[in-house]
Amino acid sequence: MGALCRRLARGASLAAVYGLAFAYGPAVAADEPSAIRLDVHGESRARYESLSGQFRRDFEGDDQAFFLRTLLGAEATAGAFSLGFELQDSRSYLDDAGTPLTNSFVNALDVIQAYVKIKTPSVLGAGSTTDWILGRQTVSIASRRQIERVDFANVIKAYTGLHAITTTPRGDALHLLYVALVDRLPADRESVIENNIVADEEQWNRRFWGVHYRRADALPALLPDVWLEAFVYGVNETDTDETPTPNRRYATPGGRIYRAPARARVDFDIEGSLRYGSRRATSAADDTQDLDVEASQLIARLGYTFDAAWRPRIALQYYWASGDEDPNDDRFDQYERLFGGRRGDLNNTSLHGPLTPANLSAPGVRLDARAKRWDARIHYSAASLASKTDTFVIARLRDPTGAAGSFMGHVIDTRARFWIVPKRLQLELGASAFVFGEFTRDVPGAPEGERTLFGYSQLTAFL
């Protein structure tokens, strides 16, 4: 524990030097009157992470890494037309052969947004408008559980295609989306470790689409400030020599009922979805058998915010994501997390993050608090496999006989953020613990020890 604290202190010092240099560097202004408005935005972030103990298969010992991420973007607008562009530079240092490093952590100097946007009137009523965004872009919709522009992860995922966003004066929103995935390059471990610069490329054989509608204040006579949402998302993949895939062909309909937290009132967030379609067991070229897919996901959270200066809130939560019951049949019933987020609902990610919405049954409780310049939360989950014969996904551990049981373990997750300079410089500290349950201790290939401890210190400077 002392070694972990010393590592975090060193990481905080590195982050401070890096962040201060960015925050107090030259500012870019775009306030001069002009026919063309130029909005410039950016951030530079430094994060040191330390992990004591391992839960992933084939990894052992302690780990650490120092991650840097810099974003710089601009949008030029003339009337109803806009052009947008954003660069991302994501790098890793202090890692070693035992670090589970992939291109989800490193993507040195690449374009994540290059788009044209056109604003037009909409058919959803007086005052409604539609933004038509065409090109390479990042996407977040609603709860971000289906598709998210990640915040905590070191690399932001991009897509290329069309995203139409219709909004109304009363707060309704309609999203229409059809995009191809962008492959983060390089993908080989040696190039990732070296922070090599390789241009990302579109994967035209992997397409993602969606329709998502939100009705604001949908039940005013019954309960004010309740949002109702309905959506359907889909994935279509085909194999190519350059990009082998499991040939996913999914449709995922679902819905959400949501009431935002506010002082002295009850809030809730219930979202569920069903997934139908087919896929193959692997991405191998000789795997040509399609498996039927029928999977489900549900999260339900009920909270209450007390009427106090720092807005303390307590919430109960349950997260379910189905698992595959029989590894030998012609079905695949695991609910895969594809492009949505998991940190906001479950745990810190990056070098840690044992929980993901796939083969999961996890009741939990969380406490939140926030004031003008700081916010904090602590979250506890008692995590089990939804199917004890399916995989503990992040750890890549599986007992197809089910003899190891289903209880993965106890997860405690914390985070605190403080604005050193409001809107310009933010410090974030976090820690997590994963105490192994019977499955994680007894499964074939089980990790050494009985727990993992994780901590990080992060400094972000904003333009």
Predicted regions and their residues:
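N-terminal secretory signal peptides that target proteins for export/translocation
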Residues: 1-9
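Bacterial N-terminal signal peptides
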Residues: 11-23
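Outer-membrane beta-barrel biogenesis signature
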Residues: 22-41, 59, 328-331, 338, ...
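Signature for the C-terminal beta-barrel architecture of outer-membrane proteins
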Residues: 30-37, 122-130, 150-328, 370-372, ...
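Outer-membrane beta-barrel channel domains
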Residues: 32, 56-186, 192-196, 453-456
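Transmembrane beta-strand segments of Gram-negative outer membrane beta-barrel proteins
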Residues: 32-55, 82-85, 132, 226-229
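Surface-exposed strand-loop-strand hairpins of Gram-negative outer-membrane beta-barrel proteins
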Residues: 47-67, 443, 447
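Extracytoplasmic loops and strand-loop junctions of Gram-negative outer membrane beta-barrel proteins
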Residues: 53-58, 97-100, 144-147, 192-197, ...
